[in-house]
């Protein structure tokens, strides 16, 4: 059973401008500790796309839960990792989601400059 669907589109040049203005503050605002470690290992030319994808994904995830960022789920509550094949894996540590029945999150990310898009389906696990 589908709990919710969310999508978000990010203009990558918008993220570039924000990073130029706030090169240290912006990543710390949207990435949690685990993601910041991964971010630090990236080549500088990969920073913008990495941040744009995470921004779009986290917005789409919060929309799929019907709350939006800052109203039950925050940027740092969501961790985006990848499996060995590169498939996105989502972990959420939020009081809001702890009240929900067990669920899976299906995330698709795509970027083609100047656009990045995230699409999310949250599915209730039927036991």
Curated annotation (Swiss-Prot):
Its EC number is 2.7.8.7. GO terms for molecular function: holo-[acyl-carrier-protein] synthase activity; magnesium ion binding. GO terms for biological process: fatty acid biosynthetic process. Keywords: Cytoplasm, Fatty acid biosynthesis, Fatty acid metabolism, Lipid biosynthesis, Lipid metabolism, Magnesium, Metal-binding, Transferase. It comes from the Bacteria. Belongs to the P-Pant transferase superfamily. AcpS family. This is Holo-[acyl-carrier-protein] synthase. The gene is acpS.
């Amino acid at each position: 059973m589908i709990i919710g669907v969310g999508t978000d589109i990010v203009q990558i040049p918008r993220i570039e401008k924000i990073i130029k203005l706030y090169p240290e503050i912006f990543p710390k605002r949207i990435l949690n500790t685990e993601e910041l470690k991964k971010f630090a290992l990236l080549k500088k030319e990969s920073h913008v796309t990495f941040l744009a994808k995470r921004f779009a994904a986290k917005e789409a995830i919060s929309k799929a839960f019907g709350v939006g960022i800052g109203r039950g789920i925050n940027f740092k509550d969501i961790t985006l990792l990848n499996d060995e094949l590169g498939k996105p894996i989502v972990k959420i540590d939020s009081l809001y989601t702890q009240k929900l029945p067990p669920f899976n999150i299906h995330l698709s990310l795509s970027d083609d400059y100047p656009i990045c898009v995230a699409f999310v389906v949250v599915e209730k696990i039927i036991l």
